[in-house]
A protein has these predicted regions:
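Short hydrophobic/aromatic beta-strand or adjacent loop that forms the aromatic wall/cage
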Residues: 1-3, 88-90, 197
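Pre-active-site segment of Zn-dependent metallo-hydrolases
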Residues: 5-40, 44-60, 74-88, 106-117
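Active-site-proximal beta-strand elements of phosphoester/diester hydrolases
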Residues: 13-17, 69-75, 92, 99-105, ...
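Conserved acidic residues
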Residues: 32-33, 122, 149
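Short secondary-structure boundary segments
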Residues: 39, 128, 154-156
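Metallo-beta-lactamase
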Residues: 45-97, 176-194
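Active-site-proximal loop/helix segments of hydrolase catalytic cores
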Residues: 79-146, 163
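Binuclear metal-ion centers of metallo-dependent hydrolases, dominated by the metallo-beta-lactamase
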Residues: 84-85, 150-206
Length: 206
């Protein structure tokens, strides 16, 4: 969905947007030092699945844990200035000299100051499924404007996902990445960042 586990070289663990069972995907048990929540919808703020008494960064709050720094910029969950679904926090992480951007439930093309803040990320996780968020075309527009090295699509239909959203295929097609094979984990280091689109396996697959 939009939940990722990021592990720094020193072992610090960050979990983003933990979801609940309404999504239809198996809900994992996780342990973390820091949890970030892009907005207060139940498929993005289920802190009960995260053990370890983590620090929690909600909305646009900055945080620093175990050498990992995170800040956020505010945008919207829809294309009407938040009138339909409220605000969305785009989270920027600085991990081991890498810039990692998690777009949350982005619902529109961000304003120019927001685009500048997320420019040239090493890794960007971006929703592509539409309906609740931007779709494949909207995601590509943001990618083209901000030029991340590695793009990880999220928030799309999988076999057991109960939401009325599109699968990842339209995004892969529009990005020229139809042959991308899902991977369970991804190792990223400064100077060694996989370029292009990387598809992660959903939790339902393992």
């Amino acid at each position: 969905h939009a939940c990722f586990r990021l592990t720094a070289e020193n072992g610090t663990v960050i979990v983003t947007d933990p979801y609940d069972d309404s999504v239809g995907i198996r809900v994992p048990k996780l342990t973390a030092d820091l949890v970030t929540v892009s907005h207060e919808h139940h498929d993005h703020n289920n802190l009960d699945i995260v053990e370890g008494r983590p620090k929690v960064a909600r909305e646009a709050r900055a945080a620093q844990v175990g050498g990992v720094t995170t800040q956020a910029v505010t945008s919207y969950h829809d294309d009407r200035g938040g009138a339909l679904r409220g605000r969305n926090s785009i989270r920027i992480f600085y991990i081991d000299a890498l810039k990692v951007v998690h777009m949350g439930d982005q619902g529109c093309l961000p304003a120019d100051p927001v685009l500048q803040a997320i420019l040239n990320a090493d890794v960007m996780m971006i929703p592509v499924g539409g309906f609740y968020t931007i779709d494949a075309k909207g995601a590509k527009e943001i990618v083209d404007l901000t030029r991340p090295k590695c793009v990880i699509p999220m928030h799309y239909k999988t076999e057991h996902c109960a939401y009325p959203i599109a699968g990842v295929e339209p995004f892969l097609e529009i990005m020229g990445a139809e042959g991308a094979k899902p991977v369970r984990t991804l190792s990223v280091m400064p100077g060694d960042v996989p370029e292009g689109v990387v598809v992660m396996e959903a939790a339902e697959e393992f």
